[in-house]
Swiss-Prot record:
Reactions accelerated catalytically: L-seryl-[protein] + ATP = O-phospho-L-seryl-[protein] + ADP + H(+); L-threonyl-[protein] + ATP = O-phospho-L-threonyl-[protein] + ADP + H(+)
Polar residues: compositionally biased ranges: 157-169, 226-274
Similarity field: Belongs to the protein kinase superfamily. CAMK Ser/Thr protein kinase family. NPR/HAL subfamily. HAL5 sub-subfamily.
Entry protein name: Serine/threonine-protein kinase HAL5
Residues noted as binding ATP in the record, renumbered to the chain: I483, G484, H485, G486, T487, Y488, G489, V490, V491, K520
GO MF annotation terms: ATP binding; protein serine kinase activity; protein serine/threonine kinase activity
Gene (UniProt): HAL5
């Protein structure tokens, strides 16, 4: 390891295909053997450069507002408990810099060249965090727990009278406290009731901590039963699970390891009838925040109701969660609302006449898959209900590939073979300008599937679906409309009837009658080189496809260490399939046209959501802080998953964040992603060159000739995206001091005052949570990347640990 400590990590081309070329040369440092000596595997999160021999240390930030003077040199993320002993009142409104560019204006121009489970909501405290994080390093035990909503937050209109009375009563009657359900205290107005109030005694807090440990130990976190006040006071049960919900999870999911997504967190008792339908009782809780598309209840649970595009609205009400819709089961329904959302992150809107013209003049129903038969591993169900993939057979004729040293990498030997296969087929298809559809003519082509049941209507595919040739219209249905266009083509929505042979989890959005898919039609530009187009299409598809399917833990384990079992945490990393990555399903071709089949997210993207909020009465187009926190946690989870598997997105922005109606966030558009570590590499490869969309690009990217860690530019972009959600505006247009006055102001304030006025003016529903959030933002916006906080540490921060998210992740951070 000596060489890695004296030289900076090597940089590589952003192109996946270019990176693969020469990967296994004699002089390549990516080989797992250097000078005949084997080296230990280094995880993707470990920096080999001497600059990163030590872990990131959070920079101490002076947050003068609301902080005792003697502690102003300490950051709440690393400060002693006295830092948080006092809290000031929260202002009732946000003070924004009117000089910033509004998000409702024209979008940022790109500067690049080219679970299913059942209803649940993640706890305020992340799973297993006691083993990894000692909260006493952030605040003192005597002040553990956050205050309830401030009286001065008039916009939320929440009275604390009943909560205070209940708190006083709890301090007098200890027996009453023991009988109380700690997750749902008898309060009519508490948002952060899980954490309690500072006025509550330590016994209550210990009780809450013990219950939190129970909740994190389960494989499927379930929505606890909501009882009336009398029932809660008279009950001795401390369980936070509903037996009916837990039993249903195993029936619906068919995969005990899959993540649990909460289509709706309505705090009502839910029972499952004999026919599989959900029956809700009248024991509902009070809704304390009730906006058009976002609701928060007094127990802290929340739900999203994002409108869907008209194209997917049929005769039946859309399901909030496509994964839970199958024969005999139903998701919770929402009222249908009109929406003008589109996939603006990939394609821009086009007028209706041109869209219809494109729809009529570019048929692709006879397109056939370019995916080879062995490109997909058949999935099968184990005895415990988990889904695993059958390992691929090794081709003896293929060039010898070095031993895998990084089992977490998304790009491995199978992806390498797939790159070669697809590149050859794309080039052949482009050269054959006058050729017809290749359905039936390509011996290596075959349909593909990510689940055990066939998706084609032909009954002959029921047993050997992956050996038959199926056209696009048979597999994914007929086009029902165009939702946008871009430089390289158009995107359509296709739908087909939901068949009895279809089983959850479905590969894309589904209502109770149809499956919907997003079809991205790609054509080379007139002046584009064939090699360049082939590389672009192949790289984008391979990265998205490899991230959106479960990795083969058993096969990789045998390659890395046949005689030993992987550690439990490492095994979960291999098995985990992130719900926040857009599924890339198939790549097809017909008549010099290439078709990328993707999961449809019918609620549009974050940019459209912000614009719609601005148009519906919200002057700045911002989101509620609790709503923004939920989306931020999902974004960080998705980015963490990408980084764990050796890929950095490099172009995170609102346009590339799509939604399902239930608020499930999906990261899309991997065309500019960087593969910084493959399965054969021990080292993290740095990157150089400008890439991304200007308002979201980190400052080190603009330093020409210097290499940078692509993971840290993703972290910076996440911070910009969050600020866009809470401010409704860009922080600045470009992070170059002499080109943008707003960024120059940020640099000046941080140097002179060690704080930024906009961050100091941010407000939340809870004063202590606001401080924790503010200090994480300061560490995300470190202009020196070596001092910048990582995505992993953000997820381990107290802000994220105490952020409710509508996705419950079985995989711990």
């Amino acid at each position: 390891m000596g060489e890695s400590n004296t030289a900076a990590p090597p940089s590589r081309s952003r192109s996946l295909s270019a990176s693969i070329k020469g990967l296994f040369g004699k002089n390549s440092i990516s080989s797992n053997e250097i000078n005949g000596k084997k080296e230990a595997f280094v995880q993707s999160g470990t920096r080999e450069d001497q600059r990163y021999n030590e872990e990131h240390h959070l920079k101490k930030i002076d947050t003068k507002a609301s902080v005792p003077k003697k502690d102003t040199q300490l950051s709440p993320l690393s400060a002693p408990g006295s830092y948080l002993k006092k809290s000031t009142s929260i202002a009732s409104s946000l003070h924004l810099n009117s000089g910033k560019q509004s998000v409702t204006s024209s979008r940022a121009q790109s500067i690049s060249s080219d679970g299913n489970g059942f209803l649940s909501q993640e706890s305020f405290i992340s799973e297993e965090h006691e083993d990894d994080i000692d909260d006493t390093t952030y605040y003192d035990k005597s002040t553990r727990g956050f205050t309830n909503l401030s009286k001065e937050v008039e916009s939320y209109s929440i009275s604390r009278k009943n909560s205070i009375q209940q708190s006083r009563k709890a301090s007098v009657d200890d027996n009453e406290v023991d009988k109380r359900n700690a997750h749902f205290p008898d309060s009519d107005t508490t948002i952060d009731s899980v954490l309690g109030d500072k006025n509550k005694n330590q016994k209550v807090m210990n009780q809450i901590n013990s219950i939190s440990n129970i909740s994190r130990s389960g494989s499927v976190p379930a929505n606890p039963p909501i009882l009336s006040s009398k029932s809660r006071r008279g009950s001795n049960a401390m369980s936070i699970r509903s037996p009916s919900v837990r039993s249903t999870a195993s029936i619906v999911s068919g995969n005990s390891n899959s993540e649990v997504i909460t289509p709706s967190s309505k705090p009502a008792t839910q029972n499952i009838s004999e026919d599989g339908n959900i029956k809700k009782t009248d024991n509902t809780l009070k809704c304390v925040i009730n906006s058009k598309h976002f609701k928060v209840y007094e127990n802290g649970f929340h739900e999203h109701h994002l409108p869907v595009i008209d194209l997917v609205k049929g005769d039946s009400t859309d399901s909030l969660n496509s994964s839970t819709v199958s024969k005999g089961t139903e998701g919770i329904e929402i009222n249908r609302q009109k929406s003008s959302f589109s996939l603006t992150g990939i394609f821009k809107k086009k007028n209706g006449d041109k869209m219809n013209e494109l729809l009529d003049t570019e048929p692709f129903g006879n397109a056939s898959s370019l995916m080879p038969t062995k490109a997909f591993c058949p999935r099968y169900k184990t005895k415990d209900g988990s889904m695993i993939e059958e390992p691929l057979e090794q081709e003896t004729t293929h060039k010898k590939i070095p031993k895998i040293v990084n089992p977490y990498a998304a790009v491995g030997s199978e992806e390498l073979k797939l790159i070669t296969t697809l590149s050859d087929k794309i080039k052949k298809g482009l050269k054959n300008k006058d050729g017809q559809s290749r359905s039936g003519s390509q011996s290596g082509s075959a349909s593909s599937s990510l689940h055990t049941s066939p998706v084609a209507s032909s009954t002959s595919l029921s047993s050997k679906f992956h050996h038959a040739l199926v056209t696009c219209s048979e597999k994914y249905g007929d086009p029902v409309g165009v939702i946008g266009h871009g430089t390289y083509g158009v995107v359509r929505v296709c739908s087909r009837p939901l068949l009895i042979s279809d089983s959850a989890p479905f590969p894309s959005y589904c209502n109770d009658k149809k499956l919907f898919f997003a079809i991205k039609v790609l054509k080379p530009k007139d002046d584009e080189q064939l090699e360049k187009f082939s590389t672009r299409v192949t790289s984008e598809f391979i990265i998205g496809h490899s991230l959106s399917r479960r990795h083969k833990a058993h096969a990789l384990q045998n390659k890395v260490c046949p005689s030993k079992r992987l550690a439990h945490k490492a095994q979960r990393k291999l098995d985990w399939e992130c719900p926040n990555i857009l599924r890339v399903i198939d790549l097809m071709e017909t008549n010099n046209t290439f078709i990328e089949v993707m999961e449809l997210c019918p609620a549009g993207d974050l940019h459209s959501l912000l614009v719609s909020r601005s148009q519906s009465g919200n002057a700045i187009g911002s989101l509620h802080p609790l709503e923004a926190d939920c989306f931020m946690k999902q974004l960080l989870r998705g980015v963490q998953y990408m980084h764990d598997h050796g890929i950095a997105h490099c172009d995170l922005k609102p346009e590339n964040l799509l939604f399902h109606p239930n608020g499930l966030l999906k990261i899309c558009d991997f065309g500019t992603s960087s593969v910084f570590q493959t399965a054969w590499e021990k080292h993290v490869h740095f990157q150089n060159g400008v890439i991304g969309s200007e308002p979201y690009v980190a400052p080190e990217v603009f330093q020409l000739g210097k290499d940078y860690d692509p993971r840290l530019i993703d972290c910076w972009s996440c911070g910009i995206v969050y600020c866009t959600m809470v401010f409704g505006q860009y922080l600045w247009k470009i992070a170059i001091e002499n080109k943008d006055s707003l960024y120059a102001s940020f640099i000046s304030q941080m140097k002179d005052e060690n704080q930024f006025s906009l961050f100091e003016e941010l407000r939340h529903v809870n004063a202590d949570l606001n401080k924790l959030r503010k200090n994480v933002l300061y560490n995300m916006f470190q202009t020196n990347p070596e001092k910048r906080i990582t995505v992993d540490k953000i997820l381990h921060s107290s802000w994220m640990k105490h952020t409710r998210c509508c996705v419950s992740y079985n995989h711990s951070v």
